[in-house]
Swiss-Prot record:
Designated name of the protein: Ribosome-binding factor A
Transmembrane segments: none
Localization terms from the record: Cytoplasm
Any Pfam family matching the protein: RBFA
Family the entry assigns: Belongs to the RbfA family.
Amino acid composition bias (Basic and acidic residues), ranges on this chain: 122-132
UniProt lineage: Bacteria, Pseudomonadati, Pseudomonadota, Alphaproteobacteria, Hyphomicrobiales
Keywords, in A-Z order: Cytoplasm, Ribosome biogenesis
Highest taxon, organism lineage: Bacteria
Any one GO molecular function term: ribosomal small subunit binding
Biological role stated in the UniProt entry: One of several proteins that assist in the late maturation steps of the functional core of the 30S ribosomal subunit. Associates with free 30S ribosomal subunits (but not with 30S subunits that are part of 70S ribosomes or polysomes). Required for efficient processing of 16S rRNA. May interact with the 5'-terminal helix region of 16S rRNA.
Amino acid sequence: MAQKQTPSGPTQRQQRVAELIRHALAEVLQRGDIQDPVLGSHVVTVPEVRMSPDLKLATAYVMPLGGQDEAPVIAALERHKKILRQEVARRVNLKFAPDLRFRRDETFDEAARIDQLLRSEKVQRDLESAPREDDEGEPASSSRD
């Protein structure tokens, strides 16, 4: 029986397989199994992998440590996609080895942007002028100990 994709996100199986593939990719990249000057000169992190519902496509979000030279690193990973797929298949027991797709991880940029917004003067003013509430939803007393 086919498993339905819920609109709320990936299934538990997709998440479990994605995590196994993330660990396998990270291990291959950390050990230096791929002989490439670009990959050899960068430490590449794999913070997230997302699986398609049929588990035949894995999208790996990658970022070189320090955030520099993402384009050459992703190009090198794409060049060695076949070898990486074989290594992942060897480490993860699946019926089919998923095709790998590499994308730039933008979560660090997004986190920095949100941090910058939270530190802006306008937000600081709004936070200072907003009435505080205690756990019960009642305005907190203004006395401080």
